[in-house]
């Protein structure tokens, strides 16, 4: 696989340097088996019939069979070009298209058509917009709730530069879960996420928790971090009020992206899940093929249970989603 720059810009020096390392061969445990059931088949049929688009299919997520069987899906908003560049992310950076103000309605209609019990909404950073795209995130949550009152909504947001007014726009839409991903540890943070700041990301989670929202984040392993640094980042997240955590293996999208520093074995991921529980997270999912939206409805219910609350929004979630245990 050759290193080709996104259309409209030259290859960055960092990308050229990354490309000197060939794409790594995946270990045998980085694979998944196709397991389909009636719910998955029904959702797939609805998606095909209505011509809908989900991140699950378009990103080739290995967990699509499990998530769709639970009637969970993820949607990308704001376009497919980001104003920032993270060295692990497959979404290209550049000049985004104009804001599509009808997108929230279309996403909400897709959620209703698919009969989803839980929807995750993520998107690109839109630093080109005066409000950072905060209205788009908030309005998408509002539209989904309006059309599908029984559907839980998780929104995975950028940091909006830490601006309280932009964060409040999203918080005020009352998503069931407010997710903001820390992704990596302080020592390599600037290299991996140059447009973000470690402490600012923690502060987003603090503000979300102060607003009463269920909070969630993600850590990616295999970028060059040490075990001590992972543990410290987990402690920082918990201290910031983060309730739910996913821990994932870095999979390199293209030669332009950061090389995989190591493949983390499944048993180490189980160790990190135990560490997270000991630190006091309400729910942790940790595994080579776990992604931040994996079994999101189940994790949400673990947070609700830990808070001692009754189930609030997605009242028709099935027993499989309400279980606080899970299998990898």
UniProtKB/Swiss-Prot annotation:
GO terms for molecular function: 4 iron, 4 sulfur cluster binding; lipoate synthase activity; metal ion binding. PROSITE patterns: RADICAL_SAM. Its main location: cytoplasm. Its cofactor is [4Fe-4S] cluster. Residues 68-282 form the Radical SAM core domain. It is an enzyme of class 2 (transferase). It catalyses: [[Fe-S] cluster scaffold protein carrying a second [4Fe-4S](2+) cluster] + N(6)-octanoyl-L-lysyl-[protein] + 2 oxidized [2Fe-2S]-[ferredoxin] + 2 S-adenosyl-L-methionine + 4 H(+) = [[Fe-S] cluster scaffold protein] + N(6)-[(R)-dihydrolipoyl]-L-lysyl-[protein] + 4 Fe(3+) + 2 hydrogen sulfide + 2 5'-deoxyadenosine + 2 L-methionine + 2 reduced [2Fe-2S]-[ferredoxin]. The keyword DNA-binding does not apply. It is found in: Cytoplasm. Its EC number is 2.8.1.8. Keywords: 4Fe-4S, Cytoplasm, Iron, Iron-sulfur, Metal-binding, S-adenosyl-L-methionine, Transferase. Binds 2 [4Fe-4S] clusters per subunit. One cluster is coordinated with 3 cysteines and an exchangeable S-adenosyl-L-methionine. Pathway: Protein modification; protein lipoylation via endogenous pathway; protein N(6)-(lipoyl)lysine from octanoyl-[acyl-carrier-protein]: step 2/2. [4Fe-4S] cluster 1 binds at residues 56, 61, 67, 293. [4Fe-4S] cluster 2 binds at residues 82, 86, 89. PANTHER family: LIPOYL SYNTHASE, LIPOYL SYNTHASE, MITOCHONDRIAL. NCBIfam families: lipA (TIGR00510), PRK05481.1 (NF004019), PRK12928.1 (NF009544). HAMAP family: Lipoyl_synth (MF_00206). Belongs to the radical SAM superfamily. Lipoyl synthase family. This is Lipoyl synthase. It comes from Frankia alni (strain DSM 45986 / CECT 9034 / ACN14a).
């Amino acid at each position: 696989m050759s290193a080709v720059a996104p259309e409209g810009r030259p290859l960055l020096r960092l990308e050229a340097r990354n490309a000197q390392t060939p794409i790594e061969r995946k270990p045998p445990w980085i694979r998944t088996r196709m397991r389909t059931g009636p719910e998955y088949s029904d959702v797939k049929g609805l998606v095909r019939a209505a011509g809908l688009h989900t991140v699950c299919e378009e990103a080739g997520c290995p967990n699509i069979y499990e998530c769709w069987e639970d009637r969970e899906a993820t949607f990308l908003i704001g376009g497919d070009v980001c104003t920032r560049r993270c060295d692990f992310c497959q979404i290209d950076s550049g000049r985004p298209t104009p804001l599509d103000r009808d997108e929230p309605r279309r996403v909400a209609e897709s959620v209703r058509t698919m009969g989803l019990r839980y929807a995750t909404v993520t998107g690109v950073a839109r630093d080109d917009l005066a409000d950072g795209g905060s209205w788009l995130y908030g309005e998408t949550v509002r539209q989904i709730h309006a059309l599908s009152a029984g559907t839980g909504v998780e929104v995975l947001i950028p940091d909006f530069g830490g601006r309280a007014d932009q964060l409040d726009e999203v918080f005020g839409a009352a998503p069931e879960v407010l997710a903001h991903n820390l992704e990596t540890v302080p020592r390599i943070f600037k290299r991996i996420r140059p447009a973000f700041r470690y402490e600012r990301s923690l502060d987003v989670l603090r503000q979300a928790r102060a607003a009463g929202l269920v909070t969630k984040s993600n850590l990616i392993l295999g970028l060059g971090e040490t075990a001590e640094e992972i543990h410290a980042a987990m402690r920082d997240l918990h201290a910031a009020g983060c309730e739910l955590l996913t821990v994932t293996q870095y999979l390199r999208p293209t030669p332009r992206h950061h090389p995989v520093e190591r493949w983390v074995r499944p048993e180490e991921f189980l160790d990190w899940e135990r560490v997270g529980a000991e630190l006091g997270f309400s729910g942790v999912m940790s595994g080579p093929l776990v992604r931040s939206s994996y079994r999101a409805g189940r994790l949400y219910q673990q947070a609700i249970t830990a808070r001692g609350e009754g189930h609030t929004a997605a009242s028709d979630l099935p027993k499989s989603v309400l279980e606080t245990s899970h299998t990898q």
